[in-house]
Amino acid sequence: MEKKVKYQQKEDKIIFFHIVMLQNKIKKIHPSNIAVYVGLDFVGDGLIKLPFIRSLKQVFPKSRITWIAGTHKSEFKHSLSPLVQGLIDEVIEEANVGFIGISDANFKQRINDLINFINPPINGRQFDLLIDTQTHVLTTLIVKTIKHKYFLSGTANFLFSNIKPPKNFVRELNLSQRLVQLAEIASGSKINVPPPPLPLDDKYRKLAKVALPKNNYVGIAPGAGDMSKCWHLKNFLDVAKDIVQKKRIPVFFLGPKEKKLLQFIKKEIPISVFPEWGKFRKSNIKGPAFVIALAERIQCAISNDSGTAHMIDAGGCPIVKVFGRSLPGKYTGLTPGSISIDSRDFGTTNINEIKPAYVNKILDGYFK
C-alpha cells in the first residue's frame, strides 16, 4: 500500500545550492579511490551514516571506497555488512588513528597517534580523496596523516580542508543530512538521497513477506539502548490497543534486551505480531537487514530514539519518534512523512508527558 503521508521537499534550498555552487566555480574532482574516516560505528551510528554512503556512491560510482574506523570496530564489517554490499569495498577497523581526541584513551594510544606523523597510517597507503566525518580539531590533525591528494573535513569551519563548501554554506542540524553535505561538497553538486529499497539479499525480504503478508501493520519499537530515552511501556501498549481497535495490526520490534517483555505483551495484546521471535526466528536471517526488510512492509511506526528506529527509517517507513531529554533535530528520520514529538512542546523534558492519545491521532494520519 502506498504511503499516504507525503513530504514537501524544500526546492528553494536546492535551487539556492546550485546557484551558489556556480557562483563559486568549485572544481570537481574525480577520485579513483576514496577513504572515509570515522572513529567507530555502532549499529545506530552506522545507520545514521547510511544515506551518506549511498550518496557518496551515487556521485562517485566508479570510485573504490575504503571505510576506516580509526579507534574501534565498525558494524559495517559485521551486522551492517549486508546493507553496504556494492557500496563500501573495504572496511578497516582499529586503524590506530584518532585516539588523541578521546578523553579515556591511554598513554600508549596517544603516543601511537603522534607516531602517525612519522610513519603514515594504513601502511602508507594513499587515497585520492580522504573524508573526515568527525569535527574534533586534534583528531583531524591526526587523520590528515593518512596520505591523500584531497582532504575534506568540516572541522573548524573547513579550516583544514582543501575542498571548501560554497559561500553562505549552512550546516544542517540533522546528522544524516550533515554527512550528505560532505558528499555534496566533494562532488560539487546537490544530492537527492537515493530512496529505499536498499540492496538486500532476497532471503530477508522473503521471510519478511511470510511474517507480514498483509498491509495494515503499525510498527512499535518500545526499547532503546539508553533506558532514559524510553517512553513508558504502558504508553506503547495503550497505542497498540488503539491500533487493534481500529482494525490494524501492531508489529512489535523487540531486541534481545526486550525479550523479557515478549510474553507480557502477548498477554496484553494477543493479536500482536513479533516477527523477530518464535516461528519466524532464523539463525541466518536476523539483525538490522531483517528489520529493514520488515519495515518495508509496515504502514508507519512509533518508537523511542533508538537503533531500531534508525533501522525502520532505513526501510523507508515513516516513523513517529518520541523525545524527552534528547533533542530531536539531530536524529529525525529522513523518510518522507516521519515526525518527531518533543516533550518540550508540552513544557517539560519528561518524555512520559507525551500522551498516547496525541500519538494515536498522528498515526491515524498515515491511513487517510
What are the residue ranges of the model-derived segments?
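Catalytic machinery of carbohydrate-active enzymes
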Residues: 2-368
